[in-house]
Amino acid sequence: MNIAELRAFMADIRTRQAKLDAQMLEANARMISLMHDPVAPTFVIPERELVAHGGLTSREAREVVSRGLVTEVAPEMGAVLAAGDTTAAHVDALGRGLKIAGAEREAFLTHLPELVEASTTMTASQFDQLVKETAKSVVADDGLSTFERQKRETFVIAGLIRLV
């Protein structure tokens, strides 16, 4: 196998892994929907089920549940993952961006179409950097939050004070 064939082989594996990750997210979503079934609600703890019957470690199960929350907010990202066009690492990066955005989540989500498109062409680390920059750009407030925090503080952290 030459390098071109190895690269094609790895790309095929990546696509299959993305589709498997999407199926795990689908199973997680189904477990959650079973809990909220109005006819026959079933008590299910998705993490436990994923560990006991999905063959995952506790950490991997938590990651699946976390990714499920991300794809619930951004179903477009789940769709490209199911198509095999992006990876679970890209979904994780988007989740970190949502955490950074915090209260400015809606402003961050206005950039979602561009981010989803970028996730199909960028590496996970490049995409992570783009997501962080995008999230920080929507929460930037020209120092107003820093000023508000400083007004509430009851002590001085650094600097000289001159009392007259």
List PLM regions with ranges:
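Conserved C-terminal region and hinge/linker of Rieske [2Fe-2S] proteins, especially
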Residues: 1-164
